[in-house]
Amino acid sequence: MKIRNLLTVLAALVIVGGIYVFAVSRPDDARGAITVWYVEGGTMSNEFVALAAGYNKSISRASLPVQCVPFADEDAMAAAFDTQAPDLVLCSHYRAFDMHARGKLTGISAALGDNAPDYPRALSSRSACIGASYFPVGAEVQVLFVNTTLTAGRDLTTLEALSAAAEEYRTETGKPFYAAADYAPLFFTEYLREGEEFDAGSAARSSKVYKHIYNLLAENAYTGALSLTSGDEVSAVRAGELGCAVVGTTALPKKLSLGVSVLPVPPLTAAGGEGELGEAWGLAVVARGSRSTGDISAFLAWLFSSNRDTRLALQTQLVPARTSSLITRDALWSALIALNTGEIVALPPADSDFAANRADFERDIRARLAFLAQ
């Protein structure tokens, strides 16, 4: 009888011990998690997932880990919102602004308190959700990618000067001097600097700014100084086939080799102001069904400290959204950091006229320039 009672006690201890072992060794997702939805293979996705894994290793068991949930594309992620919702979404400002307009985002400024990231006013003024329910990490902008050997001694400080330099180079070598990967963003940026709004619609062609830009491009296309060959403009500059090219930052090489550099897109004229078109990427706070915004704000406070957000932006070839104190010897990183001057970064919403007309404008301007080049 005593033996039977002893075995019963031992069995009970084993069960209790098993429960205890399970409680302290169970996987993190059994405790719940901060869910982050993202498009697999999208901008910043791989780098963000790696950073989130680092966060999970650094926290105590009292904090919720981050669980990254991939989707095949934007449509698949949008469809998932019909039945469920995450805590955070890694997305561009286009999606974030749309969600904000439909009341789908949750402000967590109070939960962040003094840990809220500070953004330049020129950026934070783009939307009320920035810094409250949407937290940009970086932005893609157009830059001038330059072959320093071919452009040595040539004036690239304005679009007018660049056009003139292209004609000189064409006369000297018989070769094209520059190219542009996309024209619509270039027009948008130049309009912004001239104090006008570019909607990419047909009425835009009546603007003096449009005619000024178009005439410069048209002359260069007619003489062959502007390359209209669609392809890898970055490789052409690196190989010495072009002196420079207007490209997006995500098209730049991961490392800048000797003989190339990155400059801001030049203003139309010396009297031009500041501003540029950007596409921001960051985290939108949905927090639907979340037990607390405390864990979400703890993760965001961690992300936007110790230059982690800056490094994440630079790793994905974006201009950091916030002014950075990061010191680096990497030439590309230094160039991207220098591009954040606190000037106006225009972030048009997805339902803007520019977004609606952009593709048609791009096709039209390319067709016009190609006709002149024949």
How would you label these PLM feature ranges?
Residues 1-95:
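Conserved N-terminal structural module of periplasmic/extracytoplasmic solute-binding proteins
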Residues 91-145, 154, 161, 262-265:
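Hinge/lid segment of periplasmic solute-binding proteins
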Residues 94-100, 238, 246-260:
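A ligand-binding cleft/hinge motif common to bilobed small-molecule-binding domains
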Residues 199-231:
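Glycine-centered hinge/linker elements that transmit conformational signals in sensory
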Residues 311-367:
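Long, aromatic- and glycine/proline-rich binding clefts that accommodate carbohydrate-like moieties
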